[in-house]
Amino acid sequence: METTNFGFIISLLFVGIPTIFLVGLYISTSDGEKSSFFSDSSKGKLGPKS
């Protein structure tokens, strides 16, 4: 029972985290913030070492 529950949580996280990331990326794209995000990252604004 615990092993099945643990496996269910792992699979839920494995599917849920990328889904949340894609939804957030889609929302930012709909708001038109995706292009500004990539332009900022290419300038090294978000990553000081890059």
Swiss-Prot record:
Protein function: One of the components of the core complex of photosystem II (PSII). PSII is a light-driven water:plastoquinone oxidoreductase that uses light energy to abstract electrons from H(2)O, generating O(2) and a proton gradient subsequently used for ATP formation. It consists of a core antenna complex that captures photons, and an electron transfer chain that converts photonic excitation into a charge separation. This subunit is found at the monomer-monomer interface.
By what name is this protein known? Answer: Photosystem II reaction center protein M
Q: State the UniProt keywords alphabetically.
A: Membrane, Photosynthesis, Photosystem II, Reaction center, Thylakoid, Transmembrane, Transmembrane helix
What subunit structure does UniProt give?
PSII is composed of 1 copy each of membrane proteins PsbA, PsbB, PsbC, PsbD, PsbE, PsbF, PsbH, PsbI, PsbJ, PsbK, PsbL, PsbM, PsbT, PsbX, PsbY, Psb30/Ycf12, peripheral proteins PsbO, CyanoQ (PsbQ), PsbU, PsbV and a large number of cofactors. It forms dimeric complexes.
The biological processes this protein is annotated with in GO are: photosynthesis, light reaction
Tell me the segments the record calls region Disordered.
Answer: 31-50
Question: What is the protein's species of origin?
Answer: Prochlorococcus marinus (strain SARG / CCMP1375 / SS120)
**Which family does the similarity line name?**
Belongs to the PsbM family.
**Topology class, membrane:** Single-pass membrane protein
Which domain of life, per UniProt? Bacteria
Membrane-spanning regions, if any? 7-27
Lineage of the source organism? Bacteria, Bacillati, Cyanobacteriota, Cyanophyceae, Synechococcales
What gene does the UniProt entry assign to this protein? psbM
Pfam families found in the cross-reference section: PsbM
Protein's UniProt keywords contain Repressor: no
